[in-house]
Amino acid sequence: MWNNEWIKEKDYPAWGDTEVYKKTIGGGYLLTGESPYDAYKRVSNTVARRLSRPELAETFFDYIWKGWLCLASPVLSNTGTDRGLPISCFGIDVADSIQDIGGKNLEMMLLAKHGGGVGIGIN
């Protein structure tokens, strides 16, 4: 949730000083008590640690803070948390049988129903 006491360029980036940004990021992207600054640090540190390249954390943060790198919704919401995966799309491989085509079609429809993008590999 957006906190009106946050300070521009300390708690959120200068480019985020718009009603659209405040409404969007305050609408579920942040953890309880977390500012945009904290969220960007969480993502940057987690990604750098996952890559075994801790020296990249500050570079990732700077790119996000300057608006040079825009994070997909699940990346911002879920990276460094236990509340979901940082993924926007799903991949499905389909075998050459009527049964598999039907089963994978159902899987694709269920993923799409929940907002997931789906890529299909047909063998």
Regions found by a protein language model. Name each.
Residues 1-123:
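Extended catalytic cores of very large enzyme megasubunits
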